[in-house]
Regions:
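Class I S-adenosyl-L-methionine-dependent methyltransferase catalytic core
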Residues: 1-235
């Protein structure tokens, strides 16, 4: 993997479960790789500021949270998922972009440190101090909603960039359907997009989506996974 737009910095402050809420069933994603893919999407964008970024399989919102912390050009982040328990975690993670949300997390970590005296909680408090500079104020918003991205999405939404990591569990549950749910997802996402919408999908390397409504701009294999980047064909 050749990194063009994201330096090999120390991203330990963004580790899942440290400050950002995580868990055994909560998907995360390599920070540098996610940021590289997002910034490759930016290269193809005509407008590069005040962006609405959407993840239709957001899980606990880890990827969107990290991207919004690292990229001030994102002014609205939107996540949807079919699992309401994941959306609850995503809401908590999205709140970390606000002073109030980060203050609440700081209090939680302080209480854990006082109760258990673990170094990991002290390290998390130190990371929280580092992340505080990435908090947003003013024109920044976030929201989540319940949705099956293979079906019509009722929410009013016009994303500038869509980025999603298709969880392995989704691929397993989608097997055997009359029509590829992955293809259905591409079709539904195209309906809500405009001609300058860029889509990045990370998936199993064996997946071969038809991607109706999208023009592929690039693809790259990552071990057993791959990502593909597209521009919407709507006009």
């Amino acid at each position: 993997m050749e990194y063009k737009y994201c330096e090999n910095d120390n991203f330990e402050d963004f580790a899942s479960g440290r400050v950002i809420y995580g868990g055994t069933s909560v998907p995360n994603f390599p920070v540098r790789l996610g940021n590289e893919i997002f910034r490759r999407c930016l290269i193809y964008k005509k407008g590069k500021d005040n962006l609405t970024v959407y993840d239709p399989c957001c899980g606990g919102g880890y990827l969107l949270t990290v991207l919004s912390m690292l990229n001030p050009c994102i002014t609205e982040m939107v996540g949807s998922d079919i699992d309401d328990s994941m959306l609850q975690i995503a809401e908590r993670n999205f709140s970390l972009l606000s002073q109030d949300g980060l203050a609440k997390r700081k209090q939680e970590l302080k209480e854990l440190a006082q109760k258990y005296g673990k170094q990991s909680h002290l390290d998390a408090l130190n990371s929280l101090g580092n992340l505080k500079t990435l908090c947003r104020s003013g024109d920044f918003s976030y929201r989540t909603f319940h949705a099956d991205c293979t079906k019509p999405i009722q929410e009013s939404l016009h994303p500038d960039i869509i980025i999603t990591d298709i969880p392995y569990g989704n691929l397993v549950s989608w097997e055997g359907a009359a029509e590829s749910p992955l293809n259905l997802m591409y079709r539904q996402l195209a309906k809500m997009s405009h001609e300058d919408t860029i889509l990045a999908v990370i998936m199993d390397k064996k997946q071969k989506p038809e991607a109706n409504g999208w023009l592929r701009l690039e693809k790259q294999q990552l071990g057993k996974r791959k990502f593909e980047i597209y521009r919407c064909l709507n006009n």
